[in-house]
Swiss-Prot record:
The gene is Noc3. Belongs to the CBF/MAK21 family. The modification Phosphoserine is found at residues 187, 198. This is Nucleolar complex protein 3. SUPFAM superfamilies: ARM repeat. It is found in: Nucleus, Nucleolus. GO terms for molecular function: chromatin binding. It holds the Pfam family CBF. Residues 35-45 have a biased composition (Basic and acidic residues). A motif (Nuclear localization signal) lies at residues 41-48. GO terms for cellular component: Noc2p-Noc3p complex; nucleolus; nucleus.
């Protein structure tokens, strides 16, 4: 049966919570006890001092009498009662006379007779009967049993069997009533009691403070158990503290100190060492709290003494200032942790390195979550120096953080600051930095930046000046009309945030200038640096925004690197060639440069990539092929174009299926753009002049026109169905319709999209492999073939002549093959 949900109004719930008292902690109980003692002391001080002295004298005499009776073996309480009654009666008898005095003396005699009658045998017998009755009732209670119902059992037949059992009867202990004085004190204190936070015991770690250390011999197992228990206890404590901070951070700001104590190596409160796991948990927990409660804006400084604020505004300003102080203290703690592994003379142990890695990751998370808050520039400056540390895990974390900030930064303020700090770091280290310092700049969003904007602004200013002179020569009516139009246009520009765009464009221009300053400094001063590969990759990425004045010098420097440095890898060579062709395909077309030597470099390094570890580098070749075969196809001769097609198709046999598809996509696009390549589909070898030499590095003189694209026959039997279809499509002359035509969803994909969509590095085959059909294979019964035609008859006779022997469990057939062979 389902439970019925009952809705309670907010008013009833508030009244219920108001009347409900929270349980008192140990500190609250101690405070109440101290208040009670203070009230009692005030009452005693309020009485007359003479009565106090008299009471002290009486108490002293009574105490001496009690000690004397106790030494004689008598009960001092009984003697006190009798003597006190006698003295009181004698004092009253002096004031009475007549019948009252006689009645008082009769009562005195009855009381004496009652006290002396305890030695009477009848009275002793009655006392014995009472004691026996009490002992019998106690025995009956001990032997009394109570029936309790147990859980029912369901039998195999489906019947439910109820069960009961008998247990001993244990009466509930009677609760003693509180003294009236205590009740009065509690009622007086209820109005003035302030309940403290119920989490204070956990925050102040009262449990650890009260636990006394036990000195005994312990084993390794006990140490591990104690360590795990301490970790679980601190986990619970950190969870309580963090939940309180997230619930109401304005009132729980002091709880940050408890977390900061857990981050230190020695806990200042308990004077004990914190476990490494607890320190990491504390750092991560504080980071998550700040990620949740920090505002998205930058907190300003407000002087509350010089100006009056409303109560709500004052509370908000006070909270923001306190939050800012706690955030600053947390960053100082993280800086101290990272300084141990980054500075000279630091304690570099595996534990400190792991802790510093956690601290760096937390700073990265804070920079990504709140890139515009106070002290975030300090975080970025520290992370820039950690980008050049000796630990790869930290460098990877900072590298990924900077790329994320570059892609998400809308204002470009933090991006500009980070790029400036990286430039300063590379300059001070004299280009001796790790590769991550350069590769993180690849995440910059600087695709559409015009570095010639200043010249264009000067031309625009001249045009506006001439337009102004024309306006001065207009009539008064026309001037008023132009003035109104200008005001309307200005308002429209404000609504479109045109000024914002101009400021953003100016920052973006400054960023790209700083990036190219880094690149050109390394190419000029240290062309053999270990970051040369990253520099060349960055130049290839941003070559389209390089200023036209630097084109010729840059091409000369890259050509010198390609020819002089023999130890240069294939990847660096491909980046150099890609950068040069990107320059020549854009604004560099006006330059009078012969790129024949760069064609040779590219043709020589096309077969360096295969289906191995460097298969991902085939994307560099694809981007270069777009510049060479597509954008500059009209500047290439027929022999060179055919040579590139032949070598490209030869290299496709050494690639994975996604690389082969990208190669075929490039060839298909080139076939569609020019009709020169149709000769390569003809197998007649008499068309060209000479013989094709595939080992020659010069594409102009390898005689590619004398060969054909024989690799298409091999690719037509490829294991991938899309590769087979694409190879047949090219072999048929790239038809749009009819036999050999491609489906629309494959034909519209570019070479880069084919390389990405059909990538199987994530263990996903595209298209999906269908499941085999369920069914049993049909077994065909074949005929027996014999070399001798009479073998079947002789073998039948031999089986008939065989003797059958009987054993206990089975029958055996004995055949004499030896006699049959003779």
């Amino acid at each position: 049966m389902g439970t019925k949900k009952v809705k309670i109004s907010s008013v009833k719930r508030a009244a219920h919570l108001k009347s409900k008292k929270t349980p008192l902690s140990k500190q609250q109980q101690q405070k109440q006890k101290q208040k009670r003692d203070q009230l009692k002391s005030k009452r005693e001080q309020g009485q007359n001092i003479f009565s106090q002295k008299a009471r002290k004298r009486d108490n002293l005499a009574q105490r001496k009498k009690h000690n004397k009776l106790a030494s004689l073996g008598l009960d001092p309480l009984e003697e006190d009662n009798e003597d006190g009654d006698d003295e009181m009666l004698e004092n009253v008898a002096d004031m009475l006379d007549g019948d009252d005095l006689a009645l008082l003396q009769a009562n005195k005699r009855k009381r004496k007779a009652k006290t002396t009658g305890e030695n009477d045998p009848d009275q002793g017998q009655s006392i014995g009967l009472e004691r026996a009755y009490a002992s019998d009732t106690k025995k009956e209670q001990d032997a009394q049993k109570i029936k309790l119902d147990l859980l029912p059992i369901k039998s195999r037949d489906g019947q439910i069997i109820t069960r009961t059992t008998e247990v001993d009867y244990i009466p509930k202990p009677k609760q003693k009533k509180k003294n009236e004085e205590e009740e009065e004190d509690d009622s007086e204190e209820d109005g003035d009691t302030e309940y403290e936070d119920s989490d204070d015991d956990v925050v102040n770690d009262v449990e650890a403070a009260t636990a006394a250390p036990v000195q005994k011999l312990i084993s390794t197992t006990d140490l591990l158990i104690a360590r795990q228990q301490e970790i679980e206890r601190q986990k619970y404590r950190i969870g309580i503290i963090c939940s309180g901070l997230l619930e109401k951070p304005e009132d729980k700001m002091r709880n940050f100190h408890a977390l900061y104590e857990l981050m230190d190596e020695i806990n200042p409160a308990s004077r004990q060492a914190n476990l490494m796991a607890v320190r990491k948990l504390a750092i991560i927990s504080v980071t998550e709290i700040f990620k949740d409660i920090l505002p998205e804006y930058r907190v300003g400084q407000v002087d509350t003494k010089m100006q009056t604020l409303r109560k709500a505004t004052l509370d908000r300003v006070t909270f923001e200032n306190a939050l800012l102080q706690q955030f600053k203290k947390f960053l100082q703690k993280l800086e101290q942790i990272t300084a141990q592994v980054n500075r000279r003379g630091g304690l570099r142990t595996p534990q400190t390195v792991k802790l510093a890695t956690v601290a760096v990751q937390c700073m990265c998370d804070l920079l990504v979550a709140h890139p515009y808050f106070n002290y975030v520039q300090n975080i970025a400056q520290l992370l820039v120096y950690m980008l050049n540390c000796n630990y790869a895990e930290m460098r990877t974390a900072v590298h990924q953080c900077f790329r994320t900030v570059f892609s998400n930064d809308k204002r470009l303020e933090m991006t500009l600051f980070i790029v400036r700090r990286i430039n300063h770091l590379i300059k001070t280290k004299q280009n001796n930095v790790h590769v991550e310092c350069i590769t993180c700049l690849m995440g910059l969003k600087i695709k559409n930046v015009n570095l010639d904007a200043e010249k264009e602004n000067e031309l625009k200013q001249k045009k506006l000046e001439s337009h102004r002179q024309r306006l001065l020569s207009l009539s008064k009516k026309e001037r008023k009309r132009r003035k109104k139009l200008t005001e309307v246009n200005r308002e429209l520009e404000e609504t479109r945030a045109e000024e914002n765009k101009q400021a953003k464009h100016q920052k973006l221009t400054e960023i790209i200038k700083m990036v190219f300053t880094i690149y050109f400094r390394v190419l000029k001063n240290d062309p053999t640096s270990r970051v040369l590969s990253a520099i060349l990759e960055g130049l290839a990425e941003f070559a389209h925004v390089i200023n036209l004045d630097f084109f010729s010098d840059l091409i000369d420097v890259l050509n010198r690197i390609l020819e002089d440095q023999d130890e240069l890898g294939y990847r660096e060579r491909l980046h150099c060639v890609q950068t040069i062709f990107v320059i020549l395909s854009g604004q560099g077309e006006v330059l009078n440069i012969d790129p024949i030597r760069f064609y040779q470099h590219f043709y020589r390094n096309m077969l360096a990539v295969q289906a191995g570890k460097n298969h991902d580098d085939f994307a560099i070749i694809l981007r270069t092929l777009d510049e060479v075969l597509v954008k500059r196809r009209r500047n290439m001769s027929q022999q060179r174009l055919m040579a590139f097609m032949k070598r490209l198709l030869t290299g496709s046999l050494h690639l994975l299926h996604n690389g082969t598809l990208a190669t075929l996509g490039t060839i298909k696009q080139t076939f569609q753009l020019t009709s020169v390549l149709d000769n390569l589909l003809d197998t007649d070898t008499t068309i060209g002049s000479g013989r094709y030499d595939p080992e020659l590095d010069d594409p102009e003189y390898c005689n590619a026109a004398s060969t054909a694209l024989y690799e298409l026959a091999l690719l037509a039997r490829h294991y991938h169905p899309t590769v087979r279809r694409m190879a047949v499509h090219i072999a048929h002359g790239v038809p749009a319709t009819g036999e050999g035509a491609l489906p629309t969803e494959i034909g519209k994909l570019t070479s880069h999209e084919l390389f990405t969509q059909f990538d199987s590095t994530q263990m996903a085959f595209n298209p999906t492999i269908p499941l085999p059909k369920a069914g049993q294979p049909k077994l065909k019964r074949g005929k027996h073939l014999y070399i001798r035609s009479d073998f079947k008859q002789e073998y039948g006779k031999l089986l008939q002549q065989g003797k059958v022997s009987q054993t206990k469990d089975k029958q055996t057939l004995q055949i004499d093959f030896f006699s049959a062979l003779q």
